[in-house]
Amino acid sequence: MEKLIIAGREFNSRLFLGTGKFSSNEWMEQSILASGTEMVTVAMKRVDMESTEDDMLKHIVHPHIQLLPNTSGVRNAEEAVFAAQMAREAFGTNWLKLEIHPDPRYLLPDSVETLKATEELVKLGFVVLPYCQADPVLCKQLEEAGAATVMPLGAPIGTNKGLQTKEFLQIIIEQAGIPVVVDAGIGAPSHAAEAMEMGASACLVNTAIAVAGNPIEMAKAFKQAVEAGRTAYEAGLGMQAIGFVAEASSPLTAFLNE
């Protein structure tokens, strides 16, 4: 499996993990390690910025993991830039998952403010990974603005409904000159495998692992699914038949006359 490269950094794993909704920090840490991930997102609002010994961070920080603070909770570009600067100071990284969703019910990203914030943050030296609508035009604009990746949603956050935006994701992947990370809505390992088979660069998963009966085993399942999907994509999937006419894999029938 080819390595994933984002902003010059190589990643062996193409599975990114979120850290919300776990029943305990211990379950979270063990799930992170079981998944093999090298990219972990953490919402700034969940971290005690005043404490240098926040218990949650102790379970996330590992030498092989790129910490990716996110701006979940901000409502516009101005708030996002402010939050990003706080995150850079607190976490010592210029990597940022940009999330702007002013509607607290559906948590859908604001496309206008996301593009505006991306332009500003890139100028300030941030490595910006924006969570966005599965809009091919917007994703191309974010790429042109300097985003390190685009992170279009598969379905609304936390719904576990899979790739509801599949047709748009296919266009985004086809047109992209930067990695495409499918984010939000992935509820089963099969969803992740499907995204990777389409050519997605990576998947970000949180809820499906965190609320599973056994998060550690589910993390392992997602690891295997992402690897299988990516390997299948790199190997070259066979074309699907048109219509419903079967085609035998062993069509020779001469032996019947022997």
Swiss-Prot record:
Entry's EC annotation: 2.8.1.10
GO biological process: thiamine diphosphate biosynthetic process
Binding site for 1-deoxy-D-xylulose 5-phosphate: 158, 184-185, 206-207
Record InterPro entries: Aldolase_TIM (IPR013785), Thiazole_synthase_ThiG (IPR033983), ThiG (IPR008867)
Keyword Hydrolase part of the UniProt annotation: no
Compartment(s) of residence: Cytoplasm
Main location: cytoplasm
Catalytic reaction(s) noted: [ThiS sulfur-carrier protein]-C-terminal-Gly-aminoethanethioate + 2-iminoacetate + 1-deoxy-D-xylulose 5-phosphate = [ThiS sulfur-carrier protein]-C-terminal Gly-Gly + 2-[(2R,5Z)-2-carboxy-4-methylthiazol-5(2H)-ylidene]ethyl phosphate + 2 H2O + H(+)
Keywords on record: Cytoplasm, Schiff base, Thiamine biosynthesis, Transferase
Pfam families: ThiG (PF05690)
GO molecular function terms attached to this record: thiazole synthase activity
One term under GO cellular component: cytoplasm
Entry similarity comment: Belongs to the ThiG family.
Role this protein plays: Catalyzes the rearrangement of 1-deoxy-D-xylulose 5-phosphate (DXP) to produce the thiazole phosphate moiety of thiamine. Sulfur is provided by the thiocarboxylate moiety of the carrier protein ThiS. In vitro, sulfur can be provided by H(2)S.
PANTHER family: THIAZOLE SYNTHASE
Name of the featured protein: Thiazole synthase
Organism: Bacteroides fragilis (strain ATCC 25285 / DSM 2151 / CCUG 4856 / JCM 11019 / LMG 10263 / NCTC 9343 / Onslow / VPI 2553 / EN-2)
Classification lineage: Bacteria, Pseudomonadati, Bacteroidota, Bacteroidia, Bacteroidales
